[in-house]
Amino acid sequence: MSVEPIVDTAPAVSDEVRKTTCYMCACRCGINVHLRDGKIRYIEGNRDHPVNQGVLCAKGSAGIMQHYSPARLQSPMKRVGPRGSGQFEPISWEEALQTAVDWLAPIRKDDPKKLAFFTGRDQSQALTGWWAQQFGTPNFAAHGGFCSVNMAAGGIYTLGGAFWEFGSPDWDLTELFILFGVAEDHDSNPIKMGLGKLKTRGARVISVNPVQTGYAAISDDWYGVTPGTDGLLILSLVRELMRAGKIDIDYLVRYTNAPWLVIRNPGAANDGLFLRDADGTQQVIDRATGKPAPHTDAKVKAALQGEVPVEGGGVAVPAFMLMADAYLTDEYAPEAVAPQVGISAERIRQLAADLAEAAFAKEVVIEQPWTDWKGEKHDRMVGRPVSMHAMRGISAHSNGFQTCRALHMLQLLLGSVEAPGGFRFKPPYPKPPHAHPKPAGRPDQVAPETPLGGAPLGYVLGPEDLIIGADGAPQRIDKAYSWDAPMSAHGMMHMVISNAVAGDPYKVDVMFMYMANMAWNSSMNTRGVMDMLTETDPDTGEYKIPKLIYSDAYSSEMVAYADLVLPCLLYTSPSPRDYAASRMPSSA
């Protein structure tokens, strides 16, 4: 009898392991990169990472192909032919950096806003935003401005955070999980792990998506909504839940601004503002006295209905009454919205009934004493086991901001935010807009050879925070934070090239793009963008964007239109210190 040879079933694939974060999608999973003789041999999930807990998808595993792609840029280059021709010659890092300094130094000395610096994916935004601030230009923004900023901003302004990086559903207690327009590249592995938990427990999964693919393929029910009409569907659900009384009144009174008094004084300057006391604290109607009282007073039990007179004219009513007036109308009846959303009135009512049943017939009770924000003590925690997730599918529309706010409002009406079984934030969220920085870039915040007077991106709270001049004109090249787009929390990267070419609101001298392939990915106008990048001034013959620096890891479409190309690191590259020591001159 022959003896079978001993086979090593777990051979060592590496002599070194580096830990990093995967950038193959927006999920940001932790990975272990195995190297042998300095070469990447294998990529696996990091079991100690909180995002993916060791899970890695096929795209993440294929990161090795990205690292060794033949399209990787190997050295700095300068353009020697017309823009778009792809004619370059390699140059040294010393020459490349000196060229960049020669172009940028005069701008910082004379007028920093003549530099427009815009980046792609936001993983490096802490560094790139800081660099822009130190340079002194207000013209900085990142990828989010034409991706899912409506979701992030809508969430921050409504409840202090949105989905994805802000938190996640309570996978262990949720009874009904609804996905609105979710693509597989946002929160990929955590969502898959969560869906696995739900399916194992027998919880329901509903998909609202124009196509039944990906996650929708494993859902228990699918609503094929007409693209761009999710908000109308959501508001119809709001109407049905309010009509049926299936909303969490106690939650709204205690933890939202539903009882805050709003001034109704048509034509007056204070119309639509919150009623405040002399200290600026928002007021509610005290159920015991029927009079206004600070919403922060622990002794006050606020009312959701009522009316009080306002000194100087008009009345003030709870915000909840304005919501009821707006949505308890025939405009949002299922029969009225059905033709537009592509879903029958009967099915819309069924979805509302499913929400109500999960939230109120299956409420979660945890016998755990706790103290709320007012200092009031409670014997138990009561949760509404309904959770939701949405991203670009509902946000990337002209009505995306308000659609996202409607979805967050629906969660609040059900009482399913920051409650057992619902959506749970992770630190440091929730953070309301006033806890975030305000954007800097007003004329008094921009000065030669001086850092910008604050962060270039942020959240405006009123007209006084807009980045405009004394005449009301936009001060940023993308017109973000102006009357054109006052709540553009991540800036508007997709407007940069067209505005710079048009000289509206002004011209720029240098455009610096980092990992941002705008020649290809620019509001579905790639041909127009390529034409703009090569457009010349008829009087001078010079390009309307005089100088363009581009930093990327690959020879993308944008590289062909750059004047100076700077290779960039990948997430699988050595550390910046190692990279600099091996590839850059000491003078850099």
Positions of PLM-derived features:
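A glycine-rich, hydrophobic/aromatic-adjacent loop/helix-cap motif
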Residues: 335, 351-504
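Ordered core of a single globular domain
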Residues: 504-508, 512-537
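A short helix->loop->beta-strand "cap" motif at the edges of active sites that frequently abuts
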Residues: 198-204, 538-547
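N-terminal export/assembly segments and adjacent metallocofactor-ligating motifs
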Residues: 1-250, 254-306, 316, 322-324, ...
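Conserved small/polar residues in nucleotide/adenosyl-binding loops
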Residues: 571-578
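Short, polar loop motifs at secondary-structure junctions
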Residues: 209-213, 551-557
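Acidic/polar loop patches that form or flank catalytic/metal-binding clefts of enzymes
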Residues: 247-251, 346-349, 362-364, 387, ...
